Every structure is written in structure tokens, then in C-alpha cells.
């Protein structure tokens, strides 16, 4: 499985300096300071990433394996991902033998097509939806009986991350896994993770530095049991996203 996914990543990287439009996470505050399920975050800034950069942007082999293990060990059947990028993370998640269907959402039309090409090489149970996250959730959530595993990626802003969680939360099964990506992307995202990791809907929350993993099933009155695994895995420095200094349409290599 790993070799198949990494081979697909190498195929993407072969595109070299060819560019593809992506939506880069906006600066904190672009969507206001308060999160609600109703107020929709602003979309990201369109930038042009080289194919080589896109291949590096997806979760690497180590973190991809972590995603696969979480999907496999939780026996997740219905999976939901926000932020397909080139489809690498979705390929790892949907490779679990328990996965019946994975829905992944991507705002960039070019990345959506790239994700479809990637996933067709790996699995037949992943579906790519090209739309802004909220628009796709409007269509998907009413028809999903439940969600076993949610991977919230793509829009690295505290208010936006909390908003998307609040929309997905009613569909999560007890014992379901929620993975928040890039929790050290910026101080704003770090603050978002700290807030989310204290929510009583979760029974457990684990800080892995790059990602935060929560288990649904709290009693709505107590904070979840919190595990800080950074001393074991290595502390993740708070990022300073380079894309914030770019203008719309600029090329990022």
C-alpha cells in the first residue's frame, strides 16, 4: 500500500515546474473572530504551486502511515476529508480494509482533478468533490448516515477549523476519530487546537505536534483526557506560513 501511494506521489512530482492553482489558507481574522456553524469562512487566496511543491505538500510517508493506522484500527467505514490537495492523504486513509467510502472535498478544480487521478491508482472507494467546503457539506451531510473518521485539513485558520468541526460534529459516531491537521501551522491554529482539545464532545485528545487526534464520546460535562505526545515525538515549532506574503496568482516553488 505504501509503495503504491508513494509511487503516485512521485508521478505528481514528475510534473516539475508545471503549475497548478491552489487555495492558500488566509491570514487569521479573514472570517471574523468568532466561530459559529452558520457564519461561513472566506475562501483561501489563489496561488500557483509547482507540481513538485504539491507533491511535497501532502502528508509524507510517515504521517500518511499514521493516517492509515488510525483509519484501520478505528475500523472506520465512512470517512470524510476536508482538503484533498493531490489525493495523497485520502489514498492512505481509504487504503484501510474497513473503508467503505471516503468523501474528500477540494476547492481547487485543478487539484480536484489531480486527486482523482491519484486515487484511481489506489482505490475505487474514494470520491472527490470539487467545491468550497461548506457548499460540499451542504450536499453531503444530509445524506451521510454517520461519519466514523473526519480529517479536517485545507483551511488552517482557527475560526474556520472550529466552524467545520461544528458542522460535522452532529454526524460523528461515538468512538469516532477526528484528526485536525497542521495544528502548529501558526499561533492562530495552535490556539484553535487548544480550544478544540478541551471540548466535552471528546473523551480523549492527543497532541502529536503536526496533527491533533480526538476521540468522540465525551459526557458533555468534562474536558477530555489530554495526551501531549510532543515530548516523545519531538516538539513541533509554531510555523510562519510563507504564503501569507504572496499576492494572488504568484508562483510558489
Where are these predicted regions, by residue range?
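A short alpha-helical cap/connector motif
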Residues: 1-151, 156-179, 183-253
Amino acid at each position: 500500500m505504501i509503495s503504491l501511494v508513494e509511487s503516485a506521489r512521485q508521478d505528481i512530482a514528475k510534473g516539475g515546474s508545471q503549475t497548478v492553482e491552489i487555495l492558500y489558507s488566509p491570514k487569521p481574522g479573514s472570517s471574523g473572530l468568532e466561530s459559529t456553524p452558520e457564519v461561513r469562512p472566506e475562501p483561501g487566496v489563489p496561488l500557483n504551486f509547482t507540481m513538485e511543491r504539491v507533491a511535497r505538500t501532502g502528508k509524507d510517508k510517515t504521517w500518511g502511515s499514521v493516517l492509515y493506522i488510525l483509519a484501520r484500527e478505528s475500523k472506520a467505514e465512512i470517512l470524510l476529508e476536508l482538503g484533498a490537495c493531490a489525493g495523497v492523504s485520502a489514498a492512505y486513509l481509504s487504503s484501510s480494509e474497513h473503508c467503505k467510502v471516503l468523501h474528500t472535498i477540494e476547492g481547487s478544480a485543478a487539484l480536484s482533478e489531480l486527486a482523482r487521478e491519484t486515487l484511481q491508482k489506489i482505490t475505487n472507494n474514494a470520491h472527490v468533490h470539487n467545491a468550497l467546503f461548506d457548499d460540499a457539506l451542504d450536499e453531503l451531510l444530509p445524506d451521510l448516515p454517520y461519519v466514523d473518521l473526519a480529517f479536517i485539513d485545507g483551511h488552517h485558520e482557527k475560526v474556520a477549523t472550529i466552524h467545520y468541526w461544528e458542522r460535522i460534529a452532529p454526524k460523528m459516531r461515538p468512538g469516532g476519530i477526528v484528526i485536525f491537521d497542521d495544528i502548529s501551522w501558526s499561533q492562530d491554529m495552535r490556539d484553535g487546537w487548544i480550544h478544540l482539545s478541551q471540548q466535552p464532545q471528546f473523551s480523549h485528545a492527543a497532541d502529536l505536534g503536526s496533527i491533533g487526534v480526538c476521540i468522540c464520546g465525551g459526557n458533555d460535562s468534562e474536558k477530555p483526557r489530554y495526551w501531549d505526545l510532543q515530548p516523545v515525538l519531538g516538539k513541533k515549532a509554531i510555523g510562519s506560513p510563507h504564503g501569507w506574503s504572496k499576492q494572488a496568482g504568484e508562483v510558489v516553488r
